[in-house]
Amino acid sequence: MKIALGCDHGAYLLKNKVADHLRKAGYKVVDFGTNGPESCDYPDFAAAAARAVASGECEKGIVLCTTGIGVSITANKVKGIRCALLSDVLSAKMTRLHNDTNMMALGAGIVGENLALEIVDTWVSTPFSGEPRHQRRIDKVMALEKE
């Protein structure tokens, strides 16, 4: 599986740890930056990662900033993206099982490294349940993009 990563200056250190962790687990990582502490605009990097997922270049995506809020809002503006802001393992599991999210967001100032990696592991390894009730709900959400 190929996973897109994107972050701003507030989360580049955690993004690098997530990238290394995913590579060690056998995933391919496409890093859309940023890669340093210089101030930058999170929409540039979150949108690049989201576009890679929406286009099929990457199967999933993870975006990060200090709180995760800005990058999750940005990713969700890209057609076809369902991005969940996560700060606990149960939500990581449920958003895959019930919502079939294709992106997740983390706040580097909210979750520590160990919890972040546990959330990532849970999210990437949990399949969508495929239950008709959940698919029906996803279809209704995705139909909103046509309004």
Task: Identify the residue ranges that each predicted region occupies.
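SAM-dependent methyltransferases
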Residues: 1-2, 23, 49, 144-147
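Glycine-rich phosphate/diphosphate-binding loop of Rossmann-like nucleotide-binding domains
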Residues: 4-24
